[in-house]
């Protein structure tokens, strides 16, 4: 389910049960020992628990005399939004990308290593979010878009009244460009690398600079330089 309203997202985060999940590796005399609500794998001498941090701490204190070795792994604290289950997406999701729940990923999209996509964002069919790019909360990315490495599509959750960023179909955003809150980038436009876009970008135009300004209309030469490679989107 896609959440697109800022107040709805804020309420979802407020009401969500905050979680600190841990992975607990334990050796010792573990026969009959369990952690409430946890999933366990292993033997009576060595187990791995997937558990809540607080309950895991209680377990370790209570059974300290029966535990010989312990190792704890965790990657979040009081987290409100889980990661999106990407197993059934018809898209290419590379390792090291972070996609939060309540995000929509279109068919044949490509999410590269280090990319971050926040709650309420939508990624269109055939769109590539390149390495270390960020799509903030409620960001709407159309079809066959390329968001370059390190680029930022600003999120709009706070203040909640702000209009989300909208990137229309066929847009190319160069590396390390920044698209600020409320901006709409028109169809088939090109945003040059390193640009900071503070105003709407007309369809079919090329913008560059800080702040970004229209420098020309997209011509045949620019189209050749910015064309997408379909093979990168094949599954």
Swiss-Prot record:
Its EC number is 2.3.1.89. It holds the Pfam family Hexapep_2. It catalyses: (S)-2,3,4,5-tetrahydrodipicolinate + acetyl-CoA + H2O = L-2-acetamido-6-oxoheptanedioate + CoA. Pathway: Amino-acid biosynthesis; L-lysine biosynthesis via DAP pathway; LL-2,6-diaminopimelate from (S)-tetrahydrodipicolinate (acetylase route): step 1/3. The keyword Transferase applies. Keywords: Acyltransferase, Amino-acid biosynthesis, Diaminopimelate biosynthesis, Lysine biosynthesis, Repeat, Transferase. One of its GO terms (biological process) is diaminopimelate biosynthetic process. GO terms for molecular function: tetrahydrodipicolinate N-acetyltransferase activity. PANTHER family: 2,3,4,5-TETRAHYDROPYRIDINE-2,6-DICARBOXYLATE N-ACETYLTRANSFERASE, ACETYLTRANSFERASE. Catalyzes the transfer of an acetyl group from acetyl-CoA to tetrahydrodipicolinate. Belongs to the transferase hexapeptide repeat family. DapH subfamily. This is 2,3,4,5-tetrahydropyridine-2,6-dicarboxylate N-acetyltransferase. The gene is dapH.
């Amino acid at each position: 389910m896609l959440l697109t309203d800022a107040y709805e997202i804020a309420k979802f985060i407020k009401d969500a049960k905050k979680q600190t999940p841990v992975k607990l590796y334990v050796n010792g005399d573990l026969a009959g020992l369990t952690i409430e609500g946890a999933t366990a794998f292993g033997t009576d001498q060595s187990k791995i628990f997937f558990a809540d941090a607080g309950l895991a701490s209680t377990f370790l204190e209570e059974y300290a005399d029966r535990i010989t070795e312990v190792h704890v792994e965790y990657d979040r604290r009081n987290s409100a939004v889980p990661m999106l289950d990407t197993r059934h997406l018809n898209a290419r999701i590379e390792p090291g990308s972070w996609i939060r729940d309540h995000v929509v990923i279109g068919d044949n999209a490509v999410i590269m290593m280090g990319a971050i996509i926040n709650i309420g964002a939508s990624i269109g069919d055939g769109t590539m979010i390149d390495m270390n790019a960020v799509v903030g909360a409620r960001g709407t990315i159309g079809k066959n878009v390329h968001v370059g490495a390190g680029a930022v599509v600003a999120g709009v959750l706070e203040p909640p009244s702000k209009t989300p960023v909208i990137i229309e179909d066929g847009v190319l955003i160069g590396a390390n460009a920044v698209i600020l809150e409320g901006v709409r980038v028109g169809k088939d436009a090109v945003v040059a690398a390193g640009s900071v876009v503070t105003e709407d970008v007309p369809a079919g135009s090329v913008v560059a600079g800080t702040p970004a300004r229209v420098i020309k209309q997209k011509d045949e030469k620019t189209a050749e330089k910015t064309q997408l490679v379909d093979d990168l989107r094949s599954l």
